[in-house]
Amino acid sequence: MLHQLTLAEIARALADKQFSAEELTRTLLGRIRQLDPQLNSFISITDDLAIAQAKAADERRANGENGALLGAPIAHKDLFCTQGVRTSCGSKMLDNFVSPYDATVVEKLAAAGAVTLGKLNMDEFAMGSSNQSSHYGAVNNPWSLDRVPGGSSGGSAAAVAARLLPAATGTDTGGSIRQPAALTNLTGIKPTYGRVSRWGMIAYASSLDQGGPLARTAEDCALMLGVMAGFDPKDSTSVEQPVDDYLAALQKPLSGLRIGLPREYFGAGLDSRIADAVLAVVEELKTLGATVKDISLPNMQHAIPAYYVIAPAEASSNLSRFDGVRYGYRCDAPQNLEDLYKRSRAEGFGSEVKNRIMVGTYALSAGYYDAYYLQAQKIRRLIKNDFVSAFAEVDVILGPTTPNPAWKIGEKNDDPVSQYLEDIYTITANLAGLPGLSMPAGFVDGLPVGVQLLAPYFQEGRLLNVAHQYQQVSDWHTRTPAGF
């Protein structure tokens, strides 16, 4: 079945001429039309663009090209600007915005021959952990349709998990690639801050946002990241550092790898069954030659309050550009300029976005800047220092990706703090700018569990290596949700 193939398998099959990129694209577009109404993972399906790109890929292959992503079907989280295609950011504010250019990530993947099947659902402006804040409706988890797929890259996760496509792009500001990957049985990697260009990626929190891939395997993530990563002069936060050969790194044996287990990851709030699954992964990695030691990240307890000052503060600034004047939603018959601003923003933004803008504006206001924003930045520095100390002793930090499996849609709506706490293990990597990966590690009551790996700056290859070696001796990542 074509839809069951991974990116790596697709590359080999296309090279062997077992089928064409156009055949594969048409098959998956039909599958999306048939199955996505159960999931709501797509905001836009780009049939014409996809067929045109697939035909072009087949032509390039006929002329002797043989790239790993040439003809590979993917889709983009709907905050990556895509020329000539609606780029909504999951918001009424940008419901009618058609991007005049491609984001660097979109451009790079298209140049490599990837085929864009559409734009994927997401929490509005990437603000959420459950994909319930989207203007286009909640996304359903294919493992249990009444549960959330995680967020904010929930559409990306649900679509790949349901085998609608082999891989997708996502973004991660506080866990928005890793957390949905964990809740849907995928592999997802957040690269080091500055590793992947943010040009054309609509901003939530500029010092935290980072793009990356979600796929079924570490090998597929390596294929995607190898194309997505690299310096971009159009992005002032992009780092001019050579991109490692992530595929070559996959094969390295794990003998001598030093794994750190932070004791703070295994305290109150963690589902004991998830803890058991994580420790089972640790035992498997030990048989592959890794050594394990306990470590401490003492300032982790402050991560969520610090994040929920810094991220909303940056969001309140970034989202000030959406005012009804240049582009985006504009209210009807404004009485004056103030009315235009007020009603365009009140009607165009959803409640979660407005909440975070208010929190951020408050934290930046004259009387509270020192008390909140500066204190949060100091905590950020302490968290970064904790990781520097830890990585002096270990090569990789391992723990759960999330404290709980996927919860029911609507279950935590009246308690936003409990939803924020689902990112307790992922947020620290964003605050410190570190690379992080989540990989499948088992199931609890039929719901997927993820293990998170963190590494020093620009060591994405090490994370992919550990995940790939684990996936050679486990089969969690091969499991498919019933009905898909």
Swiss-Prot record:
GO CC annotations on file: glutamyl-tRNA(Gln) amidotransferase complex
Tagged with keyword Ion transport: no
Cell cycle among keywords: no
Subunit structure: Heterotrimer of A, B and C subunits.
Keywords: ATP-binding, Ligase, Nucleotide-binding, Protein biosynthesis
Domain of life of the native organism: Bacteria
Active site (catalytic residues): 77, 152, 176
Entry protein name: Glutamyl-tRNA(Gln) amidotransferase subunit A
Gene Ontology biological process terms, A to Z: translation
Annotated function: Allows the formation of correctly charged Gln-tRNA(Gln) through the transamidation of misacylated Glu-tRNA(Gln) in organisms which lack glutaminyl-tRNA synthetase. The reaction takes place in the presence of glutamine and ATP through an activated gamma-phospho-Glu-tRNA(Gln).
Molecular function GO labels: ATP binding; glutaminyl-tRNA synthase (glutamine-hydrolyzing) activity
Annotated organism of origin: Pseudomonas aeruginosa (strain LESB58)
Family to which this protein belongs: Belongs to the amidase family. GatA subfamily.
EC number(s) on file: 6.3.5.7
Reaction(s) this enzyme catalyzes, per UniProt: L-glutamyl-tRNA(Gln) + L-glutamine + ATP + H2O = L-glutaminyl-tRNA(Gln) + L-glutamate + ADP + phosphate + H(+)
